[in-house]
Structures are given as structure tokens and as C-alpha cells.
């Protein structure tokens, strides 16, 4: 996938609107002035006519551009089968190589977002500079681009967009310049009260140029009267409901915020030179040689500046509800998430499956890569050899273009190749982390049988998923989830395996012990800790840039033009 550098995700608050750049391939970062033009406060302006929001040089929003890239993965069930974590965030304070360390840390979080990346830094003259682009981290950034991001403070973001829409989207971090200072933000999560907040803001004069829930935060900061400046961030976050682990950068501070329920992970570490690092997972700390110190606690705001690290607390303080799927699927096995080893959790899930749902078999295999550790646990407990029966191609991304309906079934074969020598004539247990729609599972069973497997027994290292997620995970609507429509026996018949078993929900909670009350199980139970009162904010359509890049849009006292 070719990377497309972009500055169009950035929001500037200069009084005079900037025109859309005519050079979409400009590699220079956009610089946000420390002291932008004086502009009126949020209470001193009257609504602008609708016609002012667009001009001959600046298209109206939202854009609707016919883009051939909408064909990419649009109907690819093979890549829709898993729930998708949509973001990973990084923040670094106090290291002269902040942008390069951020780049490396984003590499470690690449599994959390593979379709876009961005970095914002603060230069010595207090200027916020940003480079964002479409593609993998290595495709977006080069040595020359990192040279354009000097400074000892940085935040970064990797993003997964939803399949079925253009993949040329603006990516975070977002940056906004206010008359009282500039701020950048990178967000992992999803706000369940986004629609209401946006409606209230628009009613009072704010104009949005994206449908991203993250933009709401920038508008709330714009209208906040809290002092000092970083307290505007705290004030804005206290109005949010749902999941958010965010890192903010101002002209002299790094701020990390985690929602009061702690849905999404956020950890803190420190490098040997004293630099403070925040990241979605500890694997990012490991890569840049930062020592893990602790989690950012649910409801905590950590402010880092030249005087050290200060703590604030958001109100109220509900019981934590951390996403259990971080341990089942999203996080890397070498990460410590919510104080627990992801590897150990998955290994135990496999052991539980072997104990509760045994079957006579000759070999245990995994659906790579997410099912490997659970399969190792199953094999160890069952006393059966684990072998690599499916080989995953790492060169087929989610951008695979399918020319016609007739060859759609080749999608799984491109991604997974069976090893006939392992499978032929064998009774096979295949372990996967989850079943969402069931489409990929049925194709995997068929692949194994075509390779000569005598029997195919599927073991799923999570309970059945019956409800959609509203807290930052891209899952289908509940009526698309196969476990919400079929019994286990019906699913077994649908995917064509000889037997099927899921991890028991009660046993999962028992394994978590005293911590079981601290996890969110909404996808397994339909019991939502924060009640969703509106439709999901679908990330696939949350940005206005369906194919055009290079736009710089302005906010004036809360208005976005």
C-alpha cells in the first residue's frame, strides 16, 4: 500500500482561513503558530452563513468523491471476520529524539492500526508540527520526514479504518490552534454520547468538518473557560461518555487521559534518561527501552512538564470495566495489559478449552497468528502435539482488490495455506480466538478438509460474541453476529466442522478471579456498562477526505470552517 502523506487531519485556529493546498505530495509538516492571529472568543461571534463554509478554493464538507479505492476490501468477508481494534497511541516527553522514538513505538503498535499513522512534535520555539499519512508506519515516515519533526515532546497514532469505504482518510493526531494556545490529540476509543455532544455544540455555533468523535474534544476545549490551559482538557474530558485513552500535547506539556471505566489500555514508562512515555501497550515501551512503571488508572489525568508528573482525577469514579478482548485478541502476546500477561491469559484459555471440551485428536493447530498461544495451551493440556498446520502469508493486506464476486473465496487461500503433511489423514483440532460472522471459519474448515484432514474440530478461545461493541472496537451490528442468530450446534453445521466448542463465559470469569468485576463483557452478554443511546460511530466514514489530501481547515472560537 502506498503511503499518502497528509496534513488535512489538522485543525488550525488562525483567524484567516487557509486555502486547500494544491500540492498533495508536500512532505513538509504543517507548522502551527505559537501566537496565531487574534480571533474572537467563543461568545463574541454570530453564526456565519452556510455559504461561507465553502468557496471556490475550499470545497464544502463533507466531501463525497468518487474514488476507485472504495473497491479495496469493500466486500471482503475474509477481512471482516475479526473484531478490529481501531487505534494505538503513543506519547513521549523529554527526549531529543522524540519523533524517532515515537516512530519506533508506533511500529510496535502496528497491529492496532494498519491503515494510517501520524506524529505531532513540539519544536524548541513552541511550534506544533505534524505529519500524517495513509499506510503502514514505515510507509508514512522516512528519515527526511522525521528530520522535519524536531523537539523533545511527541504524540503518535496508528489507525484502523472500517472496511467498505475509501481508505484515503485523514488520520490522527488532530491538531488545533486556539488563541490561547495549540493542542494535538490522539485517541483510542469511541464516545457513546458523541451525537448529543455534537448537536449541542452545533446548536451553540460550532461547525464541524469531520464526523469523527475525536473532533468533539477539540470543540469542547475551545469553549471551556477553565484555567490554566491544560485544565481545559480535563474540563472537556469530564463531558465525555464511553471509551477514551488519549494523549494530548500542548506547547509545553504532555497529557495522558483514560476514561473512568478504563475500557482501553494506556500504560506509562520511563527511559533511562528520564523521558516519560505513554503507550497503548507495554510492547511499545519494550521496543524503545522504556521501563514499565504502571497503568494510567481509569479516570486519571497525568500532566507531564518540566516540573515532573502531576495527577488529576476525572469525575465521577465508576467501577472499572476494561475490555476483555484485549487479552483475547487485540494486544500482542508479549504485552502486559490491565496488569496481566496477555500470553499467560491466552495460554490458560487454551488449557480451559482442552479441559472442558476435550476430543480425540492427532494434532492441534492454530489459526495464525491470534490463535497460536491458545492452541499451545490446548495442546499442552491435552498432551497432543502442536504443529503448524496453517501458514499465514504476511504479504496479503486488507487492501486486496477483488475483481469479481466469482473469486472472493480465494481471499482465505491467499492469506492462509494448509500444510498437507501435517493434516492429511489426521483428526485435527484447530484453535481460533473468536468467531464473528462465521464466514472465514467455514472457509478454513473447507481448506483443512481439502488438505486431507480426516476430522476437523474447532475450539474457540472466547465465549460466543452476541452483541456489538460501542467502546472503540469495529464489530458488526448485533444482527450480523452469527452467535446472536444461531446455537452452537447450528454454527457447527454452518461452518461444516465435526465439533465446535467455545470458552465458557463462567469459566472465563472464574479464571479472572477477584478482577472479574473489572472487565467489560458487553460483547458476550449485551450488558453495556455505559448504555449506548445512539448509533455506533463508524470509523469507516468518520473523515471528510474521501480521496483528497492536503486540506487545512480552521476553527475560530469554536467554529470549524
From Swiss-Prot:
Signal sequence residues: none
GO cellular component, one term: plastid stroma
Top-tier EC class: transferase
Tissues expressing this chain: Mostly expressed in leaves, and, to a lower extent, in cotyledons.
Keyword terms: Chloroplast, Glutamine amidotransferase, Glycosyltransferase, Iron, Iron-sulfur, Magnesium, Metal-binding, Plastid, Purine biosynthesis, Transferase, Transit peptide
Homology family: In the C-terminal section; belongs to the purine/pyrimidine phosphoribosyltransferase family.
Annotated function: Catalyzes the first committed step of 'de novo purine biosynthesis from glutamine. Required for chloroplast biogenesis and cell division. Confers sensitivity to the phenyltriazole acetic acid compound [5-(4-chlorophenyl)-1-isopropyl-1H-[1,2,4]triazol-3-yl]-acetic acid (DAS734), a bleaching herbicide.
The protein's name in its UniProt record: Amidophosphoribosyltransferase 2, chloroplastic
Organism of derivation: Arabidopsis thaliana
Highest classification ranks of the organism: Eukaryota, Viridiplantae, Streptophyta, Embryophyta, Tracheophyta
